Regions:
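Hot-dog-fold acyl-thioester-processing enzymes
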Residues: 1-28, 87-106
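HotDog/MaoC-like acyl-thioester-processing domains
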Residues: 40-44, 52-106
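Hydrophobic beta-strand-centered segment that forms part of the acyl-chain substrate-binding groove
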Residues: 13-54, 58-59, 73-75
């Protein structure tokens, strides 16, 4: 669901700010959040994030979530899945993180 995807985007934001700044920073806001395709229990997601702009203390991040494996609703075998090729874009967003100047790595 949407809250689950936003939580995963937050995890990616934390990883990216640690990689860039050596500090997890604070996710200040999401903007332009779009939920494009439904996600169901049993689906597997690939989450991508990229720092697209670095300011003095702010970092703008673009996020995308793709469904890569889909659960098949099958009465005979409730654990059936299929690989999606190509993956399906299910959500995208951008967000801003803030890392205080004294917390940034040199």
């Amino acid at each position: 669901d949407g809250a689950y995807i936003l939580n995963l985007f937050g995890d990616i934001a934390t990883e990216l700010t640690i990689r860039v700044d050596g500090d997890e920073g604070l996710l200040r806001a999401y903007d332009n959040v779009e939920f494009i395709s439904p996600v169901y229990a049993g689906d597997f997601l690939l989450i991508k994030g990229k720092v697209v702009k670095i300011g003095n203390t702010s970092r703008k991040i673009g996020f995308e979530a793709y469904k890569i494996i889909e659960s098949i609703k099958n009465a005979k075998n409730n654990s059936s899945c299929k690989i999606l090729d190509p993956p399906i874009l299910v959500a995208k967003a951008s967000g801003t993180t803030v890392v205080l100047k004294d917390k940034q790595k040199c």
